[in-house]
Swiss-Prot record:
Alphabetized SUPFAM superfamilies for the sequence: Winged helix' DNA-binding domain
UniProt cross-references to InterPro entries, sorted A to Z: DUF480, WH-like_DNA-bd_sf, WH_DNA-bd_sf
Organism domain of life: Bacteria
Name of the protein: UPF0502 protein CV_4303
Similarity field: Belongs to the UPF0502 family.
Provenance organism: Chromobacterium violaceum (strain ATCC 12472 / DSM 30191 / JCM 1249 / CCUG 213 / NBRC 12614 / NCIMB 9131 / NCTC 9757 / MK)
Length: 220
């Protein structure tokens, strides 16, 4: 069961993109900044970008058909455009957020990070931006995030600070009210349990080897 997170000031009139559409947009934003020579992206390159194991929270495994369906939906919403370069039979895709939502620079970079890595603090966004955008400081991040929140419908929202958190986090609103999955906590627990089981199995194997060696010495 998903539980809605509380937004500072509320989260009304949000967008309604599914997880695949959000990931496709985030990947296009990132690659436009990081690999401009290879942008726009082919479907194959886009799938690879969506399924990266680094800088992705959560890691996803989209198939070509998943990405293609997401592209079709985004094209219908005028958020993505398909291009067929002269002399090429392979279509390429680019986002149109700067046209449709009138955002660029710091605001695009902040939205990119939120779509790819989920809720984050302003400091985390600045630290993770890397070559996507060089924020001058946390204040510039906050300015960009507030500009996204002031759009209509809003593109981002500041979450209420949770117990144990030093700073409030920000989230995108491209999929409606922000949701949290309790299963995520279970996955973390499962990873820890798997590690302990593996360590115990290795210890048992080592003990068996010692017993076998001792038996061989006694029988010899």
């Amino acid at each position: 069961m998903m539980t809605a997170l509380s937004c500072h000031g509320g989260c009304m009139d949000t967008h309604q993109l599914d997880a695949a559409e959000v990931r496709v947009l985030g990947a296009l934003l990132e690659k436009q900044a990081l690999t401009p020579d290879a942008y726009p992206l082919t479907l194959n390159a886009l799938v690879g970008a969506c399924n990266q194991l680094t800088s992705r929270e959560p890691v996803m495994q989209l198939s070509e058909s998943d990405a293609s369906a997401a592209l079709d939906a985004l094209i219908a919403k005028k958020l993505v455009a398909e291009r067929l370069p002269a002399g090429s039979r392979v279509a390429k895709y680019e986002h149109r957020l700067n046209y449709e939502w009138n955002i660029d620079g710091a605001r695009l970079a902040a939205l990119c990070l939120l779509t790819l890595r989920g809720p984050q603090t302003s400091a985390e966004i600045r630290a993770r931006a890397g070559r996507i955008y060089s924020f001058s400081g946390v204040d510039e991040v906050e300015t960009a995030l507030n500009a996204l929140a002031d759009k209509y419908p809003p593109l981002a929202a500041k979450l209420e600070r949770q117990p144990g958190e030093r700073e409030a986090r920000w989230c995108h609103l491209l999929s409606g009210e922000p949701q949290i999955l309790p299963a995520q906590a279970c996955e973390v627990i499962d990873v820890g349990l798997t590690g302990r089981v593996a360590a115990l199995e290795a210890e048992v194997s080592a003990l068996k080897a010692m017993v076998l060696a001792l038996e061989q010495r006694l029988n010899g």
